[in-house]
């Protein structure tokens, strides 16, 4: 149980997805980490616009939260995370010494939903490949400790999904960003909801949506069937997948995930 694992560690390194930084926050984490050091890492910063990151940072600051934005795959932003972890270690060491306790390597837990990039982040922090990393949910399957040079023992936990993910909007966002396995959702329904979200967010600069880019890519104006997104997908399927709506839905989602439609943020600061 996650709450039991958290009791065994000194530091939580929480990893979220920049495209959906709210949906990838664990709903119960705050009540579990009351007396723990907490570093918030928002990975995949390369997948949204720099202006969106700046505006999200302002939003988080107003809520007294100071995340580290990074692109673990390409190693950007890793130094700041390592610096923050080292500062946390020194603070924990001081606290132990003040209580007459021996200094020991601190125990840190990397935590996040499946496929938010925890393994890539750990490999960057460790400066070598210590865990498997792949763009699919569920690569990490067991708890394992990794000894780092910086006096930190890092616990790599499998991606955690709350058993009752009550917020349906969050569940949809996780599916769109491939942060939960494909077996957990119906791909055609998710593709239709994706089009609805695109049309809802099209005026928000933070979402960074180009309807022209999407329309040109598929050869059908996305505003043509604005009230019936499934009809737009059917028209696009005729052009690209011989009328196969399921294949087209899969292609649409993969195009989004691979940034073929631009650096689109599915959640924006309010």
Per-region residue spans from a language model:
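Short, glycine/charged-enriched secondary-structure capping and boundary segments
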Residues: 27-30, 54-57, 83-84, 123-125, ...
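Structural beta-sheet core signal
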Residues: 14, 40-42, 110
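Anionic group-transfer/hydrolysis microenvironments
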Residues: 16-19, 45, 125, 158
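Canonical P-loop GTPase G-domain recognition
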Residues: 45-112, 130
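Helix-rich effector regions associated with P-loop NTPase G domains
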Residues: 1-11, 19-20, 25-38, 66, ...
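Active-site cofactor/substrate anionic-group-binding motifs, chiefly glycine-
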Residues: 36-46
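Glycine-rich phosphate-binding P-loop
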Residues: 107-127, 131, 157
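Short, structured loop/turn "capping" segments at alpha-beta junctions
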Residues: 92-96, 123, 129-135, 202-206
